[in-house]
Amino acid sequence: PRTTENTVIPEFSLMKDKIVVDEIETPHHFDGYVSCDVGFRDLTVVLFGFYDFMNAQLVITDELVMNGPEMTTDELAKRIKQKEELRLFNTELNMPVAPYLRIMDNDLKLINDLARLHNMYFAATKKDNKEAQINQVRLWVQQGKIKIHERCKHLIYHIENAQWDKNRKGFLHLKDSLTGEIRGGHCDALDALIYLVRNVNEARNPFPEDFNEMKGPNVFKSPTKRKDSKLQELVNTIMNIKK
């Protein structure tokens, strides 16, 4: 696609080969994220991923796309659960883990229904300063801070083709792909990515303190020396006690 002054994420065309990957290695420890842009007439798109703390990258592993009569609360919850169990799998624990955070746009009724009926908790994202939030996504794309698995066809198509409307307040309606396999709509997958970038906690370290220590039945671990308290440090200083 041709990049114009109205292209929402122009950096993607230059970085696509580095961003879109066919294989993803999941870290031993990670914070999982789920982001949802809700549409009933438009598409509902849910993104699944994790923040790779060691490499400082947001990794999108899968997507879920629904709309029309199939878009019921029960069906949405069922499919989200299936994707979470498949994609948010901790190899260290050999089991799926609950996401650190689920977020969606401000559909408070759906948020309440998912929590009440399915024990599935979403936080409502802020949606102000949209252009500033898009600029943040552009920077992350430019810096290679986002990885997307190639199975996320709608997300890739929407990022690549999204165009601003004349007021730069929203996106122009996007035609479906030539084969009809990928729905265009209002680039809802891009909105879900914007929510994700806005809400990811880059500062949180998901690794336990003893992650790099040797473990096993034949490994002896000496007791950890307790750190001196501030009071003890002061006494040691006064008494000129050397450690």
Description of each model-found segment:
Residues F30-G49, L58-L64:
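A conserved active-site cap/scaffold subdomain adjacent to cofactor or substrate pockets
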Residues H28-F30, F40-L43, P96-A98, Q142:
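Short, well-ordered loop/turn elements at secondary-structure boundaries
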Residues N199-P208:
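Short helix-capping/linker segments at secondary-structure and domain boundaries
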